[in-house]
C-alpha cells in the first residue's frame, strides 16, 4: 500500500466519539497525576473534562467529611494547578479553565466503595443496555454486594425492586428525591 493512499475505515466514527476517547485519556492522566496529592481529609470524587460553548473546563470534584469550603477549594487549586503544568507531554489540546469544587448533592458514585457507602440512599443509575425496557432507574439503593445493585424504584404508582448487575452500570450518582 502506497503511503499516499487514504486509509478507509470499515466503521465510521463520529467526531463526538473521538473527542470522548481523547477526553477519557485526559481524565486518566489527570486522575493519575492529582490523586497522590489529594490527601486526607480530602477525597477525589471525580475528574471531568468537557466543552462548554467555546471553552474547555477541567473539573476536579473533591469532598471531605462535613463538606468542603471555599478556602478548601482555593487551597486545593493551589496544589493541583502547578501539578497539571508538570504533565509532559501536555495532554490538553486547547486552553482550559480549572474548576475545583464540591461534587454537590448529585455526586457521582464512581467506585464500588462509594456504592456500598450509599446503601440506603436515593440514587440515579444509567445502564449500558435496558433492563425490562428501562435504561435509567431512580430509587432507593437497598443493597450492593459488589456485584449486584438492588434498587426499590417507583413504576408509575407501584414500588418495584430491580437487581442490576454492576457490569451493566454506565453511571451512578446520588439523586434528590422530590
Curated annotation (Swiss-Prot):
Keywords: Cytoplasm, Ribosome biogenesis
Annotated Pfam families: DUF150_C (PF17384), RimP_N (PF02576)
Gene Ontology CC annotations of this record: cytosol
Subcellular location(s) of the protein: Cytoplasm
Transmembrane segments: none
UniProt-listed SUPFAM superfamilies: YhbC-like, C-terminal domain, YhbC-like, N-terminal domain
GO biological process: ribosomal small subunit assembly; translation
Principal location: cytoplasm
Physiological role: Required for maturation of 30S ribosomal subunits.
Family designation: Belongs to the RimP family.
Protein name per its UniProtKB record: Ribosome maturation factor RimP
Gene name in the database record: rimP
